[in-house]
Regions:
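Membrane-embedded alpha-helical bundles of multi-pass transporters/translocases
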Residues: 3-480
Length: 480
């Protein structure tokens, strides 16, 4: 039996007002500020503040990847199968996740005094798993960009600006930590907990406010279907496989990301100065997205993504050579350090492509699947891609602490040293290698599957036009 969906406005008209656009971008900014803090600093908190050993860190990273993924199997079936009312498909889920995410962010950087051993690991893993689960609901704030307008040009504009705002928001915690580090220089634990509290409060307020101000305007066929069939539709789509393989390879860069705060301490003396790594990269990412938006008017998105992978390998190799020369000279300051930070900006330019274009590819694949099957699989597509990124991400997360520190590690990082410049030369160079060259190799490999991707240009426009006609056959009467 077919359900009812909200009415779809004319697809060739501008749909999104200025206030709605701004509110949406603000909510995305503070959402990615929260997720960015976990991504940037949680490992640093566990290694240098809580001081868990490398085997505990590997176990933690494995559990917080695998367990949420298993639970998400059921969550995404609920998301894609739920009835659509006046408030839309995704907005209620973001509002549901806002408060728990803010609280869990705080708990991610707070450990009760006296906890050790098994109780400590249970506490850490429970919070990490709950964070991963709630983030599945919260992440639907990104899905909202795809359904705010049926106008293809307007949709791509929202996706582009969402990517830029996400890149900046992802670096916001770096600024907060730097400021707190100037006030409480030798108290990392306090820096982390204050940053988490501030970021959590702002995330809650803006996610709730942003969802009240936005609308969803895509018409859906609401007939209930077996969600497992939807997974099969995705796995049978050849274009989806281009994205799946690419994202699988790209997720191995988690090893490089893991090294970031530790390398910043080795180069600059303190992990709170990771801002000087993250900010140039974040600015480069935002600039890179603007460049990509301009180049999309002249070049195929597939070609741009492949070219960005080649560029990433070149830029990261250049950064490694600069950093290697600096460490070998054992210089305490000087121009090489500045040149290295400039190279981080150049590396960030590639992030503009790797963050923006896959979102556009996924939006186009969603339309291809919907045209062929009549099913809208927003959450399920991300989940299927996530199956493979979970595998590579879990491997990367488990290997990262074993590579960084402990017995038989490659880098030989020593925990608890306040001045990171006192780490050995071997440690610095190996961390630098994984942060730069290894990252560049994975980004190059991530572009290879797109040699076989054809859903661009005229083919993309043809599918979108046919889909707009198909949506006219849906029951467009509004329903609570």
């Amino acid at each position: 039996m077919s359900g009812k969906t909200m009415a779809a406005p004319a697809a060739d008209q501008k749909q999104i007002g200025t206030g709605e656009f701004i509110w949406y971008m603000v909510s995305v900014f503070f959402y990615t500020n929260m997720t960015g803090m976990v991504g940037q600093y949680r490992n640093n908190f566990l290694v240098d503040v809580v001081q868990i050993n490398q085997h505990q860190a590997a176990l933690f990273n494995t559990l917080v990847s695998v367990v949420p993924w298993v639970l998400n199997f059921f969550i995404v079936m609920y998301i894609d199968g739920r009835a659509i009312g006046k408030r839309g498909k995704f907005r209620p889920l973001v509002m549901l996740a806002a408060v728990p995410m803010g609280l869990l962010l705080f708990l991610s950087f707070w450990v009760p005094k006296g906890l050790t051993g098994a109780l400590l690991m249970i506490c850490l893993c429970t919070v990490g798993i709950l964070w991963g689960v709630m983030n599945t609901f919260g992440n639907t704030v990104n899905n909202l960009a795809v359904v705010m307008s049926p106008n293809l040009r307007e949709r791509d504009t929202v996706i582009s600006f969402r990517g830029i705002v996400s890149a900046v928001g992802n670096s916001a915690s770096l600024v907060i930590i730097l400021v707190l580090g100037l006030i409480w220089k030798d108290n990392k634990a306090l820096q982390f907990i204050l940053c988490a509290a501030l970021s959590g409060v702002m995330g809650i307020i803006t996610m709730l406010g942003g969802m009240r101000a936005t609308r969803e305007r895509i018409a859906y066929e609401n007939e209930r279907k077996n969600p497992l069939e939807g997974f099969g539709d995705i796995l049978r789509n050849k274009y989806a496989w281009n994205i799946i393989v690419s994202e699988f390879l790209k997720s191995f860069r988690g090893i490089a990301n893991f090294m970031g705060t530790f390398l910043a301490a080795a180069l600059l003396g303190d992990s709170s100065k990771f801002l000087l790594f993250g900010l140039p990269t974040g600015i480069g990412t935002a600039v890179g997205m603007l460049i990509i938006n301009f180049l999309l008017k002249k070049f195929d998105s597939r070609v741009l993504y492949i070219a960005s992978g080649i560029y990433s390998l070149i830029a990261n190799t250049g950064a490694f050579l600069i950093g290697y020369t600096y460490f070998k000279q054992e210089t305490s300051g000087g121009p090489l350090r500045i040149v290295f930070i400039v190279f981080l900006f150049l590396i960030g330019l590639q992030f503009g492509a790797s963050n923006l274009l896959p979102n556009m590819f996924q939006a186009d694949v969603l339309e291809d699947i919907e045209l062929k099957t009549g099913k809208r699989m927003d959450a399920s597509l991300g989940f299927v891609i996530g199956i493979f990124t979970m595998i590579s991400g879990t491997v990367a997360g488990a290997l990262s602490p074993l590579i960084l520190y402990g017995d038989n590690s490659i880098c030989g990082y020593v925990q608890g040293i306040q001045d990171g410049t006192l780490q050995s030369l071997k440690t610095k160079i190996w961390m630098l290698f994984f942060y730069t060259i290894f990252h560049g190799i994975m980004m190059f490999l991530a572009g290879v599957p797109f040699f076989f991707y054809k859903l661009t240009g005229a083919r993309k426009a043809e599918i979108h036009a046919k889909l707009l006609e198909q949506r006219k056959t849906y029951d467009l009467a509004a329903e609570d």
